[in-house]
């Protein structure tokens, strides 16, 4: 049926054909041509927008992590577990996935005025001098882990903090050391680790003073690790302020990070347990949250607020609701406080744990034999609990916990999906951790491939896969299920594959 018959009224007084009918048909034909052409143009624009959006996301990740191009390396014949020790923390070591790397040494800007990324106050001042060192401030790096979340890339003997998982030429703990060194110097930078990791940490951090490497006999979660360091440092310097920062987190934006830590130290000196709240970039269900309370009104720390409450990892709907309010920040597990205040909180909320840690600290620097004896007696009976649950949450209810909101980039690299976000890639292509020459793909989008065995990994027509090919183990899963890898580790252990863990 013609368009004219559909739209031209029919009556006995009007002809069904003629000049008018032809002109109407021609008009609608032109309209249809325009509509079809517009549809084609819109489809093309949508395609271009999609490509631009994907390219922008890739570029943002690269800029955020300081990566401007993917570093390619010749074939490595080893699993790449160890990052060889540098001659100094300021010299970049070889990556376990790269043949060589030329990353610039850590630079300390000469200015003491740093632009703040926090909305209300555009500029804050470092009162500690141009080298950023903060007198009386000690850094504690808890370095633990069972190597389950990035298995089989990470193992019990080589957890993720010992690996260069971002192709930057430094392991995560080396990057953490580099980041915090300007605030303290090596003399006031301590690491808490288990006996199985002490040797590797000493090799990767040759400037770490041995009396600042605190070996805990077994894992007791973050409260015992941080509490042990606090108790020891309190014996050495009762006026010390300590900051605890995990060994295996990724941080981008050094100026913003140092700005937030410096502000947290100023607040801690006023008698608070201070955490640093990360501005959430998406409604994550894998992180805990901090709810912002009233501003503290401290002139030297204008961004600091009370912590209204801590929230456990929420479901997706709750996380989205948190972000919509603008009053929540991710809880990154960074805490800054006076050692005496932390121990006072511990005595109040966990007196038995506090008593045990103080017994150990009392003999720590006296005699190694006596230290080991007390550790054998005390450590097995200590409560296994996180610092959040032990002191931060109950203290927040009494108005004794503060938060410094910050906007530097942060990720705890909790699974292969989050690791993939930190690596560069072409649009719609999988991320490659290692030698990209060992990976061939055809019609493959997203995902991450770790060619750790040295053999070729070929993928055809699969999207968002996680493929970790090590000399002794092959893992294949999806990015959506990557948080469940630790279930496989448990199953491997129960099935007698303990040697692969």
Predicted segments, located by residue:
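A short, charged helix-loop
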Residues: 293-329
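Short beta-strand segments
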Residues: 142-143, 192, 243-246, 275-279, ...
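Conserved beta-loop-beta/alpha segment of the NTase-like Rossmann-fold superfamily
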Residues: 5-10, 14-15, 210-296, 343, ...
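N-terminal glycine-rich phosphate-binding loop and ensuing alpha1 helix
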Residues: 24, 36-38, 51, 58, ...
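Residue-level signal for inorganic ion chemistry
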Residues: 173, 229, 248, 290, ...
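Short loop-to-beta-strand entry elements in the cores of soluble alpha/beta enzymes
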Residues: 328-339
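Residues at the starts of beta-strands that form the adenosine-phosphate
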Residues: 187-188, 241, 400
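Left-handed beta-helix
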Residues: 1-136, 340-501
């Amino acid at each position: 049926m013609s368009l004219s018959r559909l739209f031209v009224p029919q009556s006995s007084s009007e002809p069904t054909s003629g000049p008018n009918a032809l002109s109407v048909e021609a008009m609608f034909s032109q309209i249809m041509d325009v509509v079809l052409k517009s549809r084609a143009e819109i489809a093309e624009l949508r395609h271009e927008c999609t490509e631009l959006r994907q390219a922008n996301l890739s570029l943002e990740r690269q800029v955020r992590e300081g990566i401007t191009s993917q570093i390619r390396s010749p074939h490595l014949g080893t699993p790449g577990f160890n990052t060889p020790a540098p001659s100094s923390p300021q010299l970049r070591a070889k990556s376990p996935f790269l043949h060589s790397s030329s990353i610039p040494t850590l630079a300390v800007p000469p200015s003491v005025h740093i632009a703040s990324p926090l909305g209300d106050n555009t500029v804050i001042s470092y009162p500690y001098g141009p080298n950023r060192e903060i007198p009386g401030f000690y850094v504690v790096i808890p370095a633990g882990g069972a190597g389950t979340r990035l298995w089989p890339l990470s193992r019990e003997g080589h957890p993720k903090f010992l690996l260069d998982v971002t192709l930057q030429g430094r392991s995560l703990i080396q990057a953490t050391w580099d980041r915090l060194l300007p605030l303290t110097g090596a003399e006031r930078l301590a690491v808490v680790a288990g006996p199985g990791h002490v040797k590797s940490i000493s090799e990767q951090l040759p400037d770490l003073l041995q009396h600042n490497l605190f070996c805990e006999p077994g894992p007791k979660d973050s409260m015992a690790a941080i509490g042990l360091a606090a108790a020891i440092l309190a014996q050495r310097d009762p006026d010390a302020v300590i900051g605890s920062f995990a060994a295996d987190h990724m941080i981008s934006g050094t100026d913003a990070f140092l700005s937030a830590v410096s502000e947290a130290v100023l607040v801690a000196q006023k008698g608070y347990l201070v955490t640093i709240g990360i501005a959430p970039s998406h409604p994550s269900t894998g992180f805990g949250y901090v709810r912002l309370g009233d501003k503290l009104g401290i002139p030297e720390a204008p961004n600091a607020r009370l912590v209204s409450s801590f929230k456990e990892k929420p479901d997706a709907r709750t996380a989205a609701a948190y972000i919509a309010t603008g009053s929540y920040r991710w809880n990154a597990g960074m805490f800054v406080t006076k050692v005496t205040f932390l121990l006072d909180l511990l005595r109040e909320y966990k007196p038995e744990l506090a008593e045990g840690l103080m017994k150990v600290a009392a003999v720590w620097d006296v005699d190694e034999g006596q230290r080991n004896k007390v550790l054998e007696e005390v450590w097995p009976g200590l409560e296994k609990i996180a610092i959040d649950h032990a002191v931060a949450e109950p203290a927040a209810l009494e108005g004794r916990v503060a938060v410094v909101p910050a906007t530097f980039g942060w990720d705890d690299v909790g699974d292969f999906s989050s690791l993939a976000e930190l690596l560069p890639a072409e649009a719609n292509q999988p991320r490659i951790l290692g030698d990209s020459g060992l990976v061939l793909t055809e019609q493959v989008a997203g995902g991450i491939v770790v060619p750790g065995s040295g053999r070729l990994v070929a993928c055809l027509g699969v999207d968002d896969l996680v493929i970790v090919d090590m000399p002794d183990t092959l893992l294949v899963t999806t990015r959506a299920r990557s948080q469940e890898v630790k279930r496989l580790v448990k199953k491997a252990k129960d099935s007698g594959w303990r040697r692969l863990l």
